[in-house]
């Protein structure tokens, strides 16, 4: 029986998911947890996935379809949270798949232990080949008892295999609303900041090592695109912004929770992503611009000041040396060029 105390609202941002969306929806309507509402936010789709969404909304009373002009997954998720009527909310990507007992497992955990968040493991799958592997190996992270949100976040980050993805859990809606936790419009990998802030506010969290979600990778996945030139520069700006936002969260919550070393060091890890992208960038001018932004944005300082271990400190110092070396080389090149052409 569905009531306000056991209801789950599943939020799906929909943008041109094609026929994969049908598989996603079939996995949701066959869930063993029946106290469920499914909220599809059509984010300006132009393909047949809109017709698929209409079919399910017309034929299943617990499926709702809302429309908005294309504004991105963050805006769609925020809107879904606003209209959700469940005690808990969950998020699904429109081209993924949910295993039949996912929400029964997580909601049972949440209700029995009065959790703010229940999270699970997931399988990652290449859509083209079918190759599948578990996201978090059990030798790195096992099922837990009830923890505080910060303690669970610390444990997950320490495993180095836990990922900031919102689709591996159910979240108490009141925690989101009370603390005004929003997905940031236009920010790629917005899950990183959102999950961090949610865990900072969660009093009771629990994790199961069961894989209950199937995340599909394909050639056009955002995380797998090989970017070069301006596309790479613009993409790395998102990670630079994430380092700033994470540092701001640590600062804002320092008087409310223990800011563990892992919360600092995740900033360094995100900064190192940008450094690796600089190294792989083939276009010299773009690389120079990326290096300049690392310094002017303050990311260079965040890379160094948030180190909390010898191993990561060594990596950060190595990259610090490289960045200064590259920047000095660029400046020397500019000076020589200007001198050769008698420029002032």
From Swiss-Prot:
Pfam families per the UniProt record, alphabetical: Glycos_transf_2
Listed EC numbers:
2.4.-.-
**Keyword tRNA processing appears in the UniProt entry:** no
Q: Which CDD domains has this protein been placed in?
A: Glyco_tranf_GTA_type (cd00761)
Q: Which residues form a coiled coil?
A: none
Q: Name one GO molecular function term.
A: glucuronosyltransferase activity
Listed A to Z, the keywords are: Glycosyltransferase, Transferase
Which Gene3D superfamilies does the record match to this protein? Spore Coat Polysaccharide Biosynthesis Protein SpsA, Chain A
> What does the sequence similarity comment in the record state about its family?
Belongs to the glycosyltransferase 2 family.
Output the NCBIfam families linked to this UniProt entry: PRK10073.1
Protein name per UniProt: Uncharacterized glycosyltransferase YibD
State the organism's lineage. Bacteria, Pseudomonadati, Pseudomonadota, Gammaproteobacteria, Enterobacterales
Whichever gene encodes this chain, its name is yibD
